[in-house]
A protein has these predicted regions:
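Conserved N-terminal entry element of GNAT/NAT acetyltransferase domains
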Residues: 1-14, 22, 174
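Conserved GNAT-fold acetyl-CoA-binding loop/helix
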Residues: 25-45
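Conserved beta-hairpin
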Residues: 53-70
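Conserved acyl-donor/pantetheine-binding loop and adjacent beta-alpha core of acyl/acetyltransferases
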Residues: 69-99, 107
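Conserved acetyl-CoA-binding loop-helix of GNAT-fold acetyltransferases
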Residues: 102, 108-121, 144-148
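Conserved active-site alpha-helix within GNAT-family acetyltransferase domains
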Residues: 113, 125, 138-155
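Conserved GNAT acetyl-CoA-binding A-motif
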Residues: 116, 123-135
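Conserved catalytic-core motifs of GNAT/GCN5-like acyltransferases
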Residues: 134-135, 147-167
């Protein structure tokens, strides 16, 4: 099985939107309010991610199986952290991983971990040594995945969305 990460292209947008919608439905079925009621990734946001070349896709053979975005702009939500703090070695600049989703037909095969680790590698190849990610407090599957990938829980951040509390994680690389 051929598995690799590549930058998304404009022609990938319909497949990316389908994966995001698949993820939204999975979250809803699990009772997780993340990405619900108009919050979360949409066509405009994802098209901008692709245009800025920050959107990556996990390919399995010739099939787009997953998506994630590497943001190196300062995230206002990550500036204020509650119930903890960023690691002492934190940089003034960092890369945040956002909008991670895996097509449900590929779940249960360890590919979400491959996607997350591949995004970390891509961030490091771009020079990032401080990598951050956050997820909803009820998204236990993502929390497990984040920890398994080597991230450490640092505290809570608040996003400017409904039910915006998120658990924030960080990884410091050399």
């Amino acid at each position: 099985m051929t598995v690799y990460l590549r930058k998304a292209e404009p022609s990938d947008l319909p497949d990316i939107l389908a994966i995001i919608e698949d993820g939204r439905r999975t979250l809803q079925k699990s009772g997780i309010p993340q990405w619900q009621n108009g919050d979360g990734p949409n066509q405009e946001i994802l098209a901008k991610d692709i245009d800025q070349q920050t959107c990556y896709i996990l390919m399995i053979e010739d099939t787009l199986a997953g998506v994630g975005v590497l943001c190196s702009e300062i995230d206002p939500a990550h500036e204020a952290i509650f119930n903890g703090s960023w690691q002492p070695h934190s940089q003034t600049t960092y890369t945040a991983i956002h909008r991670v989703a895996l097509k449900s037909s590929f779940q249960g095969q360890g590919l979400a971990l491959v996607l997350l680790r591949s995004l970390v590698t891509a961030a490091r190849l771009q020079g990032a040594t401080d990598i951050r990610i956050d997820t909803h407090p009820q998204n236990f599957a993502m929390q497990h995945l984040i920890k398994k990938a080597g991230f450490v829980y640092q505290g809570d951040v608040i996003l400017d969305v409904n039910d915006g509390e998120r658990y924030a994680y960080q990884m410091i690389l050399k």
